[in-house]
């Protein structure tokens, strides 16, 4: 089988959970393929590479060719790259796309090559209204592209049961088209790794417990709510915020102001690491943490929680989206109740109470070191048992083959009409 994978993010240009997913899925598909399958990855960037049954082609930016600066140039750049990808695609038996950034290319390739289209849904645009702050009226385009892909896809992969429910609520596709295949984790790379010198390089005291956050500075990740919770956390701990890549200048400024306000309201050290930390160091930060906090207001799955759990660290997380399918309350961590403003506004309806609830859950685990240790061990066991990439890649290959066979059957059903002799209109 010739598999065409289309993605915005691909190593070394990865900034979010979707990129992590694609990276590991492609690695495992390549490893499993042998001589049976060939995988071609087309992505945004300058990546180029080839192997026996694998190659990658990056498509460079091109907004300057089509659009004046500032006039939806980011979205126009996306559309331009999609057109190029569709024009270069060839010899594929199935096309698999990730996120709205590649859905136009996927829809076009499906029509050009007459092959099944699979989309993996990592999030939904209507559930992320803050994207309008980031891309302006381009948000209308991203939402339209997502809706179009839902209508055109032969198969839809949801990364959690929560994500499947959201897809059905928002777009009402045929439920039979949706397959739930979880995200996974590399349990070799993400394992407990203790290196106190790395903590010291960030100004973290290795002898003092700390609470850890890792993520981008976005509305979705809920970091502002965690910052609001910091004054309510009991004294005697450190707070480590591994937070960079702000979506907008406005949220970057808000983050700076709120962190300074939190520092004035607590005796605990707040250590803010404002850049994206390399994986090797992130693993160390997870491993030494007393607990990890995921305050997201919208999280279809939450790979970040798997990363912490794989390193043997218990998790305090909002009970949103797919998180309860990963974090088992009372076993691998604590789930904090969450109520959104509405189905189209995922912010907490009572933000002050949410912040206090986060702090209460954090304080409860900080006060119980033996319980934290047991939860961390159970978290690692759960990750090993349920979230390995080999099983996820095999499920994906099986789904590809299922869709291919459906297409073959459909073509056979149509063949009698194709084979009928077309009458001549010559005299």
Q: Where do the language-model regions lie?
A:
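N-terminal subdomain of nucleotide-sugar transferases
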Residues: 1-49, 408-427
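Nucleotide-sugar donor phosphate/pyrophosphate-binding loop at the beta->alpha transition
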Residues: 116-118, 126-148
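Nucleotide-activated donor-binding/catalytic signature segment of Leloir-type glycosyltransferases, i.e.
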Residues: 252-276, 280
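Short alpha-helical donor nucleotide-sugar binding micro-motif in glycosyltransferases
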Residues: 284-289
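Aromatic "clamp/platform" in nucleotide-sugar-dependent glycosyltransferases that forms part
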Residues: 297
């Amino acid at each position: 089988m010739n598999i065409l994978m289309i993605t915005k993010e691909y190593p070394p240009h990865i900034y979010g959970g979707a990129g992590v997913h694609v990276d590991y899925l492609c690695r495992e598909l390549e490893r499993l393929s042998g001589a049976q399958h060939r995988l071609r990855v087309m992505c945004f960037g300058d990546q180029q590479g080839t192997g026996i049954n694998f190659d990658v082609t990056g498509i460079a930016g091109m907004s300057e060719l089509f659009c004046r600066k500032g006039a939806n140039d980011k979205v126009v750049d996306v559309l331009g790259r999609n057109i190029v990808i569709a024009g270069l695609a060839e010899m594929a038996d199935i096309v698999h796309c990730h996120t709205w950034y590649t859905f136009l290319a996927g829809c076009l390739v499906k029509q050009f090559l007459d092959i099944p289209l699979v989309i993996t849904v990592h999030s939904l645009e209507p559930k992320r209204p803050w994207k309008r702050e980031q891309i302006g009226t381009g948000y209308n385009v991203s939402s339209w592209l997502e809706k179009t892909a839902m209508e055109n896809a032969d198969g839809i992969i949801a990364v959690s049961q929560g994500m499947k429910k959201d897809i059905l609520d928002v777009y009402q596709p045929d439920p039979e088209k949706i397959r739930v295949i979880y995200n996974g984790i590399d349990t070799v790379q993400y394992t407990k790794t203790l290196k106190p010198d790395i903590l010291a390089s960030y100004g973290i005291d290795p002898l003092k417990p700390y609470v850890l956050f890792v993520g981008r500075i976005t509305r979705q990740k809920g970091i502002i709510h965690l910052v609001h919770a910091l004054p309510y956390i009991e004294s005697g701990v450190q707070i480590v915020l591994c937070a960079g890549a702000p979506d907008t200048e406005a949220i970057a400024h808000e983050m700076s102001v709120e962190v300074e306000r939190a520092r004035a309201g607590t005796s605990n050290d707040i250590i803010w690491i404002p850049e994206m930390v390399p994986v090797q160091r992130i693993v160390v930060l997870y491993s030494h943490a007393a607990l990890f906090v995921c305050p997201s207001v919208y999280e279809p799955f939450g790979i970040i929680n798997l990363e912490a759990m794989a390193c043997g660290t218990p998790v305090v997380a909002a009970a949103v989206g797919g998180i309860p399918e990963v974090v088992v309350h009372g076993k691998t961590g604590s789930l904090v109740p969450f109520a959104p403003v509405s189905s189209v506004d995922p912010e907490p309806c009572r933000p002050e109470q949410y912040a206090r609830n986060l702090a209460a859950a954090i304080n409860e685990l900080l006060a119980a070191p033996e319980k934290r240790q047991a939860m961390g061990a159970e978290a690692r066991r759960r990750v090993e048992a349920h979230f390995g990439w080999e099983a996820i890649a095999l499920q994906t290959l099986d789904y590809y083959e299922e869709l291919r066979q459906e297409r073959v059957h459909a073509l056979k059903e149509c063949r009698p009409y194709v084979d009928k002799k077309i009458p001549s209109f010559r005299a």
